[in-house]
A protein has these predicted regions:
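N-terminal module detector in large eukaryotic regulators
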Residues: 1-351
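Extended amphipathic alpha-helical coiled-coil/heptad-repeat regions
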Residues: 320-391
């Protein structure tokens, strides 16, 4: 696989510009390098004493929407001085189309995280670069990396919960570590690989990462050894503290404990099945953490497992709420609700009515229009399911 590459630096008063490129570099590629203008923030000391000259940050990033082609970029950004002695960022980047990147992440994340970055430059004197021939580093085995970072089943479940929380919530997970920034590059991509193997395949492309505290990435690093930060992370995961446990609501926690402890093939199939269920309801980009957990419980029900009353009600309630998303497949949502109500109605008719209507009444109190609509919907579905059984 070949990737275009370029180097960018501030060489004169005109500001940052591409100073070396491969022949196939496009104007869109060049514009997308602007993403790294602000990475220098993480290469200043936290106490404001100055820049960390010669230190580098490794980023796995998706360019922002700017009206042109979006790229996936692997970039090394290094703090240097320009011709006027000002602190400036030298960036060497590899480019891949967003669609190709998403396909690689969906089928095998090691095809991305395993790309060798050992020869990425921190300075460049020439102006011409050949296309980058990708060479995989190897060594990306989940069991090996979990042992390396102490990711027991309980710790791995907590990591996955935090990563899903960041990706679904549009925020960032900060990995807390005692390591200095000079030693976090391998760590962040290896932990990101562990996270990717527990992610829904269609969401993996959003698993960007940075070896510094750049909260634009889904996973970033907050080093206790120094280095500035960009923004406030949504959540944190302390790599040096093995005592924390997943103490979330059982409805959600059960999913991540399953993903952490399942055999590789079982985990892979569960993720594919969950993704299929979600895709029938809403586009993946609208999938909240709650809906992802709902897909897991629906998958279990499809195997013939009878859920507890509270789990059943939660799934019904979430499907009702899902129907309010503008892009939801309302017909599929209603069919699933009817299927669930018919499936359980014979055993728990009063319980279902009490729990489901009570949930909708609470919604009505919080949001009059939407809540009444939900309440009407669940009552119609219950009436339909009962009349269908009498036929």
């Amino acid at each position: 696989m070949k990737m275009e590459q370029a180097c960018r630096f501030r060489t004169d008063e005109a500001g940052y510009m591409v100073c070396a490129r491969s022949q196939g570099l496009t104007a869109d590629n060049e514009n997308n390098l602007g993403y790294f203008n602000s990475t220098m923030t993480s290469l200043f000391e936290k106490d404001g004493s100055g820049p960390r000259m010669g230190q580098s940050i490794l980023s796995y990033a998706v360019s922002e929407e700017n009206g042109g082609r979006r790229d996936f970029l692997i970039a090394k950004s290094t703090m240097r001085s320009d011709i006027k002695g000002r602190a400036s960022i030298f960036t060497h980047a590899y480019f891949m189309g967003l669609d190709e990147y998403a396909r690689c992440m969906e089928t095998d994340p090691s095809a991305i995280y395993g790309i060798d970055t050992g020869d990425m430059m921190t300075a460049q004197s020439g102006s011409q670069l050949p296309p980058k021939e990708t060479v995989l580093r190897g060594g990306f085995e989940l069991s090996v990396l979990r042992e390396k970072y102490g990711l027991t089943d309980e710790r791995y479940a907590l990591l996955l919960y935090n990563v899903y929380q960041a990706v679904a919530g549009g925020g960032s997970l900060a990995l807390l570590t005692q390591l200095p920034l000079s030693q976090t590059q391998d760590m962040v991509r290896e932990v990101a690989y562990c996270a990717a193997m527990g992610m829904l395949p269609g969401l993996r492309w959003r698993l960007t990462c940075s070896s510094a505290a750049d909260t634009r990435a889904a996973i970033c690093v907050s080093s206790k050894a120094g280095g500035g930060g960009m923004g406030i992370p949504l959540c944190t995961f302390d790599l040096d503290d093995g005592g924390r446990r997943l103490e979330e609501d059982p409805f959600v926690a059960e999913l991540f404990r399953y993903l952490a402890s399942a055999a590789p093939e079982e985990r892979r199939q569960m993720l594919l099945d969950m993704q299929y269920i979600l895709g029938e309801l809403v586009p993946l980009e609208y999938a909240s953490l709650e809906m992802i957990a709902t897909a897991y419980h629906m998958r279990k029900m499809n195997d013939g497992n009878r859920p507890e009353n509270d789990v059943y009600d939660r799934v019904v309630g979430n499907l009702l709420l899902c129907g309010r998303v503008p892009s939801a497949n309302q017909e599929t949502v209603n069919k699933l609700l009817i299927w669930m109500l018919k499936r359980q109605n014979a055993a728990l008719p009063k319980r279902i009515m009490e729990l489901s209507v009570d949930r909708c009444v609470k919604q009505a109190q919080a949001d009059a229009a939407g809540g009444r609509e939900l309440c009407d919907c669940v009552c119609r579905l219950l009436q339909y399911s009962r009349s269908a059984e009498q036929l």
